[in-house]
From Swiss-Prot:
GO biological process: mycothiol biosynthetic process
Keyword tags: Acyltransferase, Repeat, Transferase
Similarity comment: Belongs to the acetyltransferase family. MshD subfamily.
Domain N-acetyltransferase: residue ranges: 155-297
Species of the source: Beutenbergia cavernae (strain ATCC BAA-8 / DSM 12333 / CCUG 43141 / JCM 11478 / NBRC 16432 / NCIMB 13614 / HKI 0122)
Binding site for acetyl-CoA 1: 73-75
Broad EC category: transferase
Residues engaged in binding acetyl-CoA 2: 234-236, 241-247
Subunit description: Monomer.
Function of the molecule: Catalyzes the transfer of acetyl from acetyl-CoA to desacetylmycothiol (Cys-GlcN-Ins) to form mycothiol.
CDD domains: NAT_SF
This protein's name: Mycothiol acetyltransferase
Annotated 1D-myo-inositol 2-(L-cysteinylamino)-2-deoxy-alpha-D-glucopyranoside binding sites: 35, 181, 222, 230, 268
Pfam (any one): Acetyltransf_1
Length: 297
């Protein structure tokens, strides 16, 4: 077992782990690492701790990423049943005994390992999706963005200034105060995402009150390829809840993605967030998969 602090993960190790993640995704039919943990591997400085298991030839066959209060693990399908997952879990808990383990796709092997080390299911993340019909009349993106929201709120796109970054982070922290990952985003986390190839400032929207100009909400869209879009982050200030901003922004997002030729939209939502799930179900989203987190009961 080898352990690496964030600052000493080399390019070769990162490449080997990402190759392992690709093999695991192919074997299991689900992404093996979340974006957050993948970025922590690719960008030293995002406060992660990395654990690696190699075979006698030096090939990476197991990996765990400890980031904040959570850990994600992956084991090469050809080496399952050899105790690799158990070794990684024990090593991760030695780093932080109260860690919670993500099981992407909530596969049986992950659930069995969690039970074996005394953990219980404590959280669910729902992956939802829907298809989009081609854009019809009125599908011009510029016109859609220029049109005020139903309550008169003004929508503008992100300009990339430091003031906007800090304003967005403050809104994000308020909107996701109870969310252990999203609500803890830092300026460095935001800027790493701004540097990703998929980032498009015209798809990060800031919604201001038409009266005092206060930042009320934000919609961040992600289009990783021409056919697929994602409602990446939808945040509404708690003081602006009940104004219909979430639904209005979701409708606007679907219209803009449709205008761009996207034919499939996906998103992730907390399983216990019944209000958000109802919003998305009303907008035509249906379950694709459920990711589970296991922790101390």
């Amino acid at each position: 077992m080898q352990a690496y602090d964030d600052e000493i993960v080399g390019t070769a190790l990162a490449s080997n782990v990402l190759a392992l993640a690709d093999r695991v995704r192919t074997a299991d039919g689900v992404e093996a690492l979340s974006e957050q943990h993948r970025l922590a591997l690719e960008h030293p400085g995002l406060r992660a701790h990395h654990l690696v298991v190699t075979d006698p030839a030096g090939a990476v066959v197991g990996y765990a990423s400890v980031l904040g209060s959570s850990v994600e693990m992956l084991v090469d399908a050809a080496h399952r049943g050899e105790g690799v997952g158990h070794r990684l879990a024990e090593a991760a808990l030695a780093v932080e005994p109260t860690l919670a383990f993500w099981a992407h796709g909530d596969l049986p092997g992950a659930a069995q390992l969690a039970e074996a080390i005394g953990l219980r299911r404590v959280r669910e993340l729902w992956h939802l999706g829907r298809d989009l019909a081609p854009a019809g009349a009125g599908g011009d993106e510029a016109a859609l963005l220029a049109t005020p929201l139903p309550g008169g709120e003004r929508l503008r796109t992100f300009g990339g200034t430091e003031a906007e970054e800090h304003a967005w982070l403050a809104l994000n922290a308020r909107a996701f105060a109870s969310h252990p990952e999203q609500g803890a985003m830092t300026l460095e986390d935001l800027r790493v995402r701004e540097g990703e190839t998929w980032f498009d400032p015209s798809l990060l929207w800031l919604v201001h009150d038409d009266g005092d100009g206060a930042l009320l909400a934000s919609m961040w869209l992600k289009v990783p390829d021409a056919a697929t879009g994602e409602i990446y982050v939808l945040g509404v200030d708690p003081g602006a809840q009940g104004r219909g901003l979430g639904r209005a922004l979701t409708d606007r997002a679907l219209d803009v993605l449709r205008a761009r030729g996207v034919d499939r939209v996906e998103l992730y939502v907390e399983g216990e967030n019944a209000r958000a799930r109802a919003l998305y179900e009303h907008s035509g989203f249906t379950p694709v998969a459920v990711h589970a987190q296991y922790g101390i009961p």
